[in-house]
Amino acid sequence: MSAARGAVIWMTGLSGAGKSTLANALHLRLKEAGQAAIVLDGDVLRRGLNADLGFTPEDRTENLRRVAHVAALFMQQGFVVIAAVISPEHRHRRAAREIVGEGFVEVFVNAPLQVCEARDAKGLYARARRGEIAHFTGISDPFEAPLAADLVIETDRMPVNEGVDRLLAHLVTMGRVSG
């Protein structure tokens, strides 16, 4: 499996939906196959590149703009970029698609809110419900579910390896990697 043209897999979903788990599993499979790949994890980027940003609507927009530009740069070098970012609004995902262009794949990593809360080892949802965390997506700020995602992976119903298989099949069908 080698890069035909690279791609950006833009994983969107609530905190705890399984974006990072799926992203890391896909990354491993791509690397094992000799494919240049990188994970851009929203949590990691917020501790580094985007450490100057908060969670206001303006800061979220800027955070995702930066992620999209970095993703596009890697894709142009033949990488499969796996961006695991909440990107809660339709406009954020549209803007990312416009920045990246051809090769953008929107993946809705979906799990019910109750499942996401049950998976939350850090207790962020509980803190948000107590009002200790402002602008928390899914609690005090809305999450706009994608209306036309390229793929939907329901992590409460599908094992990780099956989700990875679906993602790889989609990339092959698109001609972004060879099978």
UniProtKB/Swiss-Prot annotation:
Associated pathway: Sulfur metabolism; hydrogen sulfide biosynthesis; sulfite from sulfate: step 2/3
Annotated catalysed reactions: adenosine 5'-phosphosulfate + ATP = 3'-phosphoadenylyl sulfate + ADP + H(+)
Keyword Repeat on entry: no
MF terms in GO: adenylylsulfate kinase activity; ATP binding; sulfate adenylyltransferase (ATP) activity
EC number(s) per entry: 2.7.1.25
Gene Ontology terms: biological process: hydrogen sulfide biosynthetic process; sulfate assimilation via adenylyl sulfate reduction; sulfate assimilation, phosphoadenylyl sulfate reduction by phosphoadenylyl-sulfate reductase (thioredoxin)
Keywords for the protein's UniProt record, in alphabetical order: ATP-binding, Kinase, Nucleotide-binding, Phosphoprotein, Transferase
Record-annotated active site: 87 (phosphoserine intermediate)
UniProt-annotated binding residues for ATP: 13-20
One GO CC annotation: cytoplasm
Function, as annotated: Catalyzes the synthesis of activated sulfate.
Family classification: Belongs to the APS kinase family.
Protein name: Adenylyl-sulfate kinase
